[in-house]
């Protein structure tokens, strides 16, 4: 059975991994997530491990760098420049930007472009605004939704925090004609990124502590794209649970 669970409240993409994101009114959803999302990342030249990407977990001020587009980019919705916290705009693939970030990090970095995206888990992350509000209440503050770095913020029909946990294993469809489909795969295990204020870069441990205390360190869900299509703010969202397994006679 398919039921309407809410609508798209906001859409976000993060062109450069761990840098500032951008809110968009609509976006194309492809097999590798939102067009232009996390296609770029800084590679740490001194890291030979399986996850060589520089993130705000290692350089918190990285979230204060803001990708910009100044004319045609390399392709799709990729940025052409990055604005530093001091307001200087540097070419996204220029040596000056790599040198600046490497200086702050303390070792050399190199900008990399991966067409399939650079994701920690799955290509799409979702959270409901009710969940964000509840975490804020538990943490004693009003956290900016950007702390959670979702691609899709959902305004649910019911005021039930953590309702998205119940969608794991099912499918969300977007729009009256099911333009796009996302299979919800698992809950989103959180890291220290949620402690960083996206406006100032200042850390506060209360948000992560609240998530650990009441939700086993999980808030929001991940999904994979099962049908490409267009997403737009205001689009209705429908949920269909996975079919119950049949018992053998």
Question: Positions of the model-derived regions?
Answer:
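Metal-cofactor-dependent catalytic cores
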Residues: 1-249
């Amino acid at each position: 059975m398919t039921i309407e669970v809410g609508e798209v409240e906001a859409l976000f993409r993060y062109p450069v991994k761990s840098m500032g994101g951008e809110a968009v009114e609509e976006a194309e959803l492809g097999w590798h997530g939102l067009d232009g999302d996390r296609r770029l990342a800084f590679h740490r030249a001194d890291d030979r491990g399986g996850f060589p990407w520089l993130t705000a977990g290692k350089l918190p001020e990285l979230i204060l760098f803001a990708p910009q587009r100044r004319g045609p980019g390399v392709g799709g919705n990729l940025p052409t420049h990055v604005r530093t916290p001091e307001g200087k705009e540097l070419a996204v693939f220029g040596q000056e930007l790599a040198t600046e970030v490497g200086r702050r990090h303390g070792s050399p970095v190199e900008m990399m472009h991966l067409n399939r995206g650079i994701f920690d888990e799955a290509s799409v992350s979702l959270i409901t605004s009710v969940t964000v509000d509840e975490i804020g209440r538990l943490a004693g503050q009003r956290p900016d939704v950007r702390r959670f770095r979702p691609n899709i913020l959902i305004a649910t029909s019911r005021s039930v925090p953590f309702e998205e946990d119940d969608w794991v294993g099912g499918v969300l469809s977007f729009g009256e004609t099911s333009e796009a489909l996302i299979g919800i795969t698992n809950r989103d295990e959180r890291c220290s990124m949620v402690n960083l204020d996206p406006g100032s870069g200042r850390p506060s441990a209360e948000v992560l502590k609240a998530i650990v205390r009441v939700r086993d360190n999980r808030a929001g869900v991940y999904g994979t794209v099962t049908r490409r299509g267009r997403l737009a703010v205001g689009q209705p969202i429908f949920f269909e649970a996975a079919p119950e397994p049949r018992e053998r006679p």
